[in-house]
Regions:
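Disulfide-stabilized cysteine-rich extracellular repeat microdomains
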Residues: 211-212
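Hydrophobic structural segments
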Residues: 1-208
């Protein structure tokens, strides 16, 4: 099949037009007429993935994160974006790259819904909307739990030991209302700050976490 047919299959699972407007999704390196003989998936473009593609004759990669570009602002404040070395390496190697990024976050049975199910949330509602009723965040109720036990629960369910909290986290006596959002939740704090006890997300800028 060619890349255009692969994109049709991807759109059935993860509609790319549901991604955030400013997000880079879809075919970002390559051409829709290119043939797909060997396909792999990855979280993001990196050297180990490139070597795997070369060693296994992989011509097409579906990633979560889009290929990285570097923003350059000249003396006249004109912006240009140059491909990072790893992006250029995939271009030079003629490997098609398709990114699903926030389309995967907001879709049915996507990252946001998976997190809500993982934490056993009930009375779930959507926030951080991209288009229509699709959104990257979920908020709802869980069984009452202490901060210490919630932290352990996050570590176990997400298989991580790298958890950072703000200074108020351990002052909470009991947690029942939570919000979850894959990726960076910084810009969506105002949507949930007064309706949940804890916001679980991948990234918050320090000033936002400290102030809220």
């Amino acid at each position: 099949m060619n890349v255009s047919i692969l994109l049709e299959h991807i759109n059935k699972l993860t509609p790319l037009n549901h991604a955030f407007e400013d997000d880079s999704v879809g075919l970002l390196i390559g051409d829709e007429s290119n043939q797909v003989e060997n396909l792999t998936v990855g979280h993001e473009l990196e050297e180990s993935l490139l070597e795997y593609c070369k060693d296994n004759n992989v011509d097409t990669v579906v990633t979560y994160h889009p290929p990285p570009y570097k923003r350059i602002v000249d003396e006249n404040d004109i912006e240009t974006y140059l491909p990072d070395p790893i992006t250029k390496s995939f271009v030079d190697s003629s490997i098609n790259v398709i990114s699903i990024h926030t389309a995967q976050d907001v879709c049915e049975e996507g990252n946001a819904e998976t997190l809500a199910e993982l934490f056993g949330m009930s009375n779930v509602s959507i926030f951080a909307n991209s288009v229509d009723n699709f959104g990257a965040g979920r908020k709802g109720k869980i069984n009452k739990i202490s901060p210490t036990d919630l932290k352990k629960d996050i570590e176990n369910k997400l298989n991580t030991k790298i958890i950072r909290t703000n200074e108020y986290f351990n002052e909470i006596k009991e947690i029942q209302n939570i919000a979850v959002l894959p990726g960076s939740g910084t810009q969506f704090i105002d949507e949930i700050i007064y309706s949940v006890d804890v916001f679980i997300t991948c990234l918050l800028y320090t000033s936002d976490a400290a102030d809220d």
